[in-house]
Amino acid sequence: IYNYAANEKLQKARTVFPLSYIKDGEQQFIEEKNWEHDHLFTKENYYTLLYDKEEDMDFEKNPSLDTVSVEWIYLDTHEIRQYHFQRKNGLWMLTTIEQHSTLEAPYEDFLEFFYKFANDSIFQREHVARPLKFVTSDPDDEFQILETTLEVDQWFAFKPLLPLHKMTN
């Protein structure tokens, strides 16, 4: 998928045209001549992945998958844009783009919580576990992992960059 997003020529070759584009349940089609290269997540400094449960992390490297979706989740406008890929003859092909409200997402409550958490430091302070389990790499040896706990005031010194308005999945 990364190569698809990064390479304009490959992207056109690996998109099924006319491409089905469904917005709020209404289907349209994008012709190849109207396609604009979409970098997906490749221009971002990081990307996020949401899992329902820890075991779902194993799917990320599962070679037997035939379908996969990449999502842009727009936290501030409550929209999701899904890029649906299907493996055809061993090649990943973009088959559909679908855009709809996050209100239809099974994890809408989490998205609402996360948006408030990322954008409101008072809300963060109220919702950080006390103490917070913290796992990081050892600055003196990047192959070693440190496990400790943080107090709420330490959270603000060690917290990662949080997506404020949009995230990938």
What are these regions (language model features)?
Residues Y21-E79, D138-N169:
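Surface-exposed, charged secondary-structure patches
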Residues V70, Y83, W92, F114-F117:
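Short, structured motif recognition centered on aromatic/hydrophobic residues
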Residues I1-G25, A105-D140:
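Core segments of small alpha/beta cavity-forming domains
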Residues Q11, Q27-Q28, Q82, Q86, ...:
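Residue-identity detector for glutamine
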Residues L75-E104, N169:
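Short beta-strand edge/turn micro-motifs at domain boundaries
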